[in-house]
Amino acid sequence: MKKAIDAVESAIIMDSEESEQLSGVMREFEEKVTAELAKQGVVANLFVGGSVGKGTCLPGIHDVDYFMRFDLKKYGEENISEVCESVLLGIFKDVLRLKGSRDYFRVKINDYEIEIIPVLYIKRINQAQNLTDQSPFHVNWIKKNVKARKNLNFDMRLAKQFFRASGVYGAESWIGGFSGHVTEILVVYYGGFEKLLKAVLKWKDKTIIDVEK
């Protein structure tokens, strides 16, 4: 197993050039948005989500997710999608608005697609007004577990690559597989990639897991 894992290491970790390119795009985006927030007097900040934010992304990724977190007290009764759009239009010529339980947005920098999800900055789950308000908690939960267990983020990448090669990676309807977040949860629950594989062999229909037990 170790030889097989070593053989795919280069396929699941970005090289320095790709990592620097991604960092440069993110830095440019964050600097522009932070400046525009200040210019418009909007009380909000950016929080990196998705696999990039959790440190579990695979090479070749050209999409980054951001949460634009709005002050709960000031914007709790406002349409924060409208505010978010105003900020983005102050920077980018082309801003794609996407429908959701709360509308979100997509912009491009070079060949990178950046999705921006407006959320309320909450400190407790029960303060959420929309499911997306809870999403940063999901990111922090993965990051907490990655920090607590050595090499867990490597195992998450490994599991994603394995599922992808097996044709079961992706929650899209035409795939019907495991999303990136669910893959990460499975690795946390079972304690690593190899343990996950062994558990999969014993799965039955409607296997239920509870990561807090």
Where are these regions (language model features)?
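N-terminal regions immediately upstream of nucleotidyltransferase
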Residues: M1-I61, D71-N79, F105-R106, V119-I122, ...
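Non-catalytic peripheral regions of nucleotide-handling enzymes
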Residues: E17-E20, R106, N110, P118-W174, ...
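Long, highly charged amphipathic alpha-helices
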Residues: G24, E28, K32, E82-V87, ...
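Conserved catalytic core of two-metal-ion nucleotidyltransferases
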Residues: V33, E82-Q127
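A short, glycine/Asx- and small/polar-enriched loop/turn
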Residues: G60-V64, N110-Y112
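Short hydrophobic/aromatic beta-strand micro-patches
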Residues: F67-R69
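Short, conserved charged micro-motifs
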Residues: K74-E82, K195-K198
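Conserved nucleotidyltransferase catalytic core and NTase-mimicking acidic/glycine-rich helix/loop elements
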Residues: N151-K213
